[in-house]
Amino acid sequence: MLRVCPHTTAAVLINENYDRGLQKDWDDFLNRLAPRDRDYHHEDGNCDSHLKAALIGNSKSLFIEHGRLVLGHWQGVFLCEFDGPRRREVRVKIVAD
């Protein structure tokens, strides 16, 4: 299965889904790499959102076995919104063996 987010300021992430503190750690980490208030050349005021989405990526390939996603015990699939809230779309394509 292929999941694609056709937006340049949102991303698809596979990561731990148990400890909510990890979400805050991700936010802190990405904000250090691409702070919102930096003087960027991009004129729309959301360059940090584009950079964060590019770092994480807009697509992930996942396996399905017996009708279920194959993920680690603590893994989850997340849509990361960096320029919202706004309406987003995630496309899913299931490819046979």
At which residue positions do the language-model features occur?
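Active-site histidine-anchored catalytic micro-motif
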Residues: 1-97
